[in-house]
Amino acid sequence: MDSFSTKNLALQAQKKLMSKMATKTVANLFIDDTSSEVLDELYRVTKEYTRNRKEAQKIIKNLIKMVVKLGVLYRNGQFNNEELALVERFRKKVHTLAMTAVSFYQIDFTFDRRVMSNLLNDCRELLHQAINRHLTAKSHARINHVFNHFADCDFLATLYGPSEVYRGHLQKICEGVNKMLDEGNL
């Protein structure tokens, strides 16, 4: 039997296209305005923290690729039942992470970087498990690159610290995340 499948070919083409075109313009086709604003703030705070524009761009580009590829796989029904259960656990963990991030911002003296870091690392592991058979080692490395940055305890402590520079970014991030939660997008 011939193993050629146009559906698989189209999916491979979509994944390849997404990996080559993870620019802001293309992301806007897949990511709504609020998400885009949150990503912009994550870029700004990352650039401020790393003092490296190129590294900040790479982290956000990898984040966008990760989100878009996950969406392509999900919309094309590529996950088996076990993987769908992992995706659902990932979605719930991201929801918990978002609620925790906003809560830590809104309620003074509640921030715990270990809690945030652990939630982010839990998300990373669930994502790796869900996409394991679908994406390349390079995609897994991108996931690690993104999560290594955002789960870094020093980064989190700086982001949630008293510095007015970071406070402004955190406020905009949390306002966007809160809006996404209200709209059921997280």
Curated annotation (Swiss-Prot):
Residues 37-70 form a coiled coil. The lineage of its organism: Eukaryota, Metazoa, Chordata, Craniata, Vertebrata. It comes from the Eukaryota. Keywords: Coiled coil, Cytoplasm. This is Tumor necrosis factor alpha-induced protein 8-like protein 1. InterPro entries: TNFAIP8-like, TNFAIP8_sf. GO terms for biological process: negative regulation of TOR signaling; regulation of apoptotic process. It holds the Pfam family DUF758. The keyword Cytoplasm applies. It is found in: Cytoplasm. GO terms for cellular component: cytoplasm.
